[in-house]
């Protein structure tokens, strides 16, 4: 009996004249991923690589939660490895579906700013490279996504589900560690110590939040001379991406803290509304939790910096 099936569509591999017409606004049927990358995201070279988009994947209801969907995707990858540049998917995103696709090696390339008429959800586009050309496509669109998502979260994506945002960010390839000036580290450490205010300068808090949620590695996160920053910045878990409140590692945020970063820092919701949504006792305890989360991120990204050490010593924290 057939218990798991997938429908694929071959996309890309378009001639230069078709790519140019797509870039200029013409729709090319049957090329959803290259169309979005080319017309919306302004990447005329995106329709050069050949990919297979998973249009639909389904497992019989009596055989679900046994890994059959993942096994089928692994077979598809093996079949097209060497014959295509990437596998891709576009779907109405939920935390559970994000968990599934991320676990199968697909990485975020785009999140729509409007909701899909059919699903009522934002649409996620994800890629799994099979060749150097596919890897280059996935790398640049992942990088461009990281570069633009911060601005979108305070605008078109301001009301997106925080677990969806956590998921699409965690499914990005990590970027470089964030770099803050000495002045910015002083402000962030001040909030972690309880004496400073987040509203003084939200910028460095947003960069640290995006770095943490995309899995950027820790490291030397500052400038010794306090100058300008050197860089910018079907099967799944029922409760959202990585939903374990374990805090065994000292520099790991809990899911609740991650939601707090999304809602308050990245989406800019009022503290009282965030406190109510995330079940904090009061606005004050919500902001205290925000300070605690940033103390964790200071440990991860700036714990070895002289400016951080000096500031912490002033407030009695080694």
Predicted regions span which residues?
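Terminal substrate-recognition subdomain of acyl/acetyltransferases
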Residues: 1-5, 9-50, 78-318
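Conserved acetyl-CoA-binding loop-helix of GNAT-fold acetyltransferases
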Residues: 56, 64-79
């Amino acid at each position: 009996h057939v218990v798991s099936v997938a429908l694929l569509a071959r996309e890309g591999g378009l001639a230069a004249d078709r790519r140019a017409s797509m870039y200029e606004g013409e729709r090319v049927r049957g090329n959803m991923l290259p169309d979005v990358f080319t017309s919306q995201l302004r990447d005329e070279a995106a329709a050069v690589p050949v990919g297979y988009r998973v249009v639909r994947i389904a497992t019989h209801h009596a055989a679900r939660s046994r890994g059959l969907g993942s096994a089928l995707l692994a077979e598809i990858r093996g079949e097209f490895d060497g014959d295509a540049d990437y596998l891709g998917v576009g779907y109405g995103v939920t935390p559970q579906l994000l968990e599934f696709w991320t676990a199968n090696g697909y990485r975020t390339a785009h999140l729509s700013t409007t909701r899909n008429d059919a699903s009522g959800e934002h649409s996620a586009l994800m890629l799994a490279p099979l060749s150097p050309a596919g890897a280059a496509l996935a790398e640049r669109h992942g990088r461009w996504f990281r570069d633009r998502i911060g601005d979108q979260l305070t605008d078109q994506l301001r009301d997106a589900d925080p677990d969806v945002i956590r998921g699409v960010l965690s499914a990005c390839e990590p970027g470089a560690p964030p770099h803050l000036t000495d002045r910015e580290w002083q402000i962030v450490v001040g909030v972690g110590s309880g004496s400073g205010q987040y509203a003084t300068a939200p910028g460095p808090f947003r960069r640290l939040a995006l770095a943490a949620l995309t899995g950027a590695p820790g490291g030397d996160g500052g400038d010794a001379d306090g100058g300008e920053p050197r860089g910018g910045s079907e099967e799944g878990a029922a409760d959202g991406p990585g939903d374990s409140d374990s805090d065994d590692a000292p520099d790991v945020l809990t899911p609740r803290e991650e939601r707090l970063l999304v809602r308050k820092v990245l989406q800019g919701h009022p503290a009282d509304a965030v406190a109510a949504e995330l079940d904090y006792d009061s606005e004050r305890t919500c902001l205290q939790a925000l300070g605690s989360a940033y103390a964790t991120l200071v440990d991860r990204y700036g714990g070895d910096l002289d400016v951080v050490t000096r500031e912490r010593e002033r407030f009695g924290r080694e």
